[in-house]
Amino acid sequence: MQKPNIIIKISGASLQDKNSNDCYSYQRINSLADQLKSLAKKYNIGLIVGGGNIFRGKLAKDFGVEINKADYIGMLATVINSTLLESKLQSLGLKTKVLSALEVKGLTNEINPKSLAEVFSDCQIAFFSGGTGNSHFTTDTATVLRAIQINAQLVLIGKDGVDGVYTDDPKKNKKAKFIEQITYQQALNDQLRVMDLTAFSLAKDHNLKLLIFNIEAEQSIIKTIENKNKHTKITN
C-alpha cells in the first residue's frame, strides 16, 4: 500500500535554543529527527525548513544588503539547514534527499518535473530547499507550491510559540480568541494573517488541507497529525 504524501514546514528558529546565540540546538534537532523517523513509517514526508536561525531580514538591513540579494542569502540558508538535518536523519537509518530550487552542485538535487514525480521512489523524506528559486516569495509560498507539486494530502505549518490561528495577535491582545477550524474564505473575509496572501490563495485554489500548530510544543508534529494537541485546521 502506497503511503500518503505530506508536507511539513518548520522555521529555522525552531532549530535553535532561544536562550542561546548558537544557530542550532542539539536537543531540538534530536527531538525533530525522532518525530520524523516515527512519521516516516506511515507517510512520505516533504520537509521545508526556513533559514531564520542563520539569516534574517534585520541582518540584511544592518549590513545594507540589497533586498534581492538578501532573499537569495535566505534561500541558501534553507539549503544549509536542510543538508544538516538530512545528515542527522541519515544517521538514524532513514533514506533522504535534498532538492533545491537553487543549484548547489554535489550537494543537492535539482527540482524539476521529473524529480518531483519520482521524489519518493528512493527516499522516505525529501527536503525542498532554496525557496521557489526567486526573490520576493516567502517560504510559505514555497511550501504550498511543493505541496501542490507532490499532491500532498496534508500540509502542516509549524509556528514559533503560537498554537494556531487567533482572531487577533494573542501576544498583543489577551482577548484574542483561538480558532479551532476555519475555511479559507472565512479567513480571507476576516483578514486573518495565517500566511502571506500568495501562499494562502494558492492553497485555497488547490483545496489543500492545512494544519497550523506550535512547533515548539513537545512532540508537536506527531500530536497534531493524531489530533492530540491544540491546532487550527483550515479547509475549503
Swiss-Prot record:
Localization annotation: Cytoplasm
SUPFAM superfamilies reported in the protein's UniProt record: Carbamate kinase-like
InterPro entries, per the entry: AceGlu_kinase-like_sf (IPR036393), Asp/Glu/Uridylate_kinase (IPR001048), Uridylate_kinase (IPR011817), Uridylate_kinase_bac (IPR015963)
Positions bound to ATP: 9-12, 52, 56, 166, 169
Binding site for UMP: 51, 71, 132-139
Function: Catalyzes the reversible phosphorylation of UMP to UDP.
Protein name: Uridylate kinase
Highest classification ranks of the organism: Bacteria, Bacillati, Mycoplasmatota, Mycoplasmoidales, Mycoplasmoidaceae
Name of the gene this protein is made from: pyrH
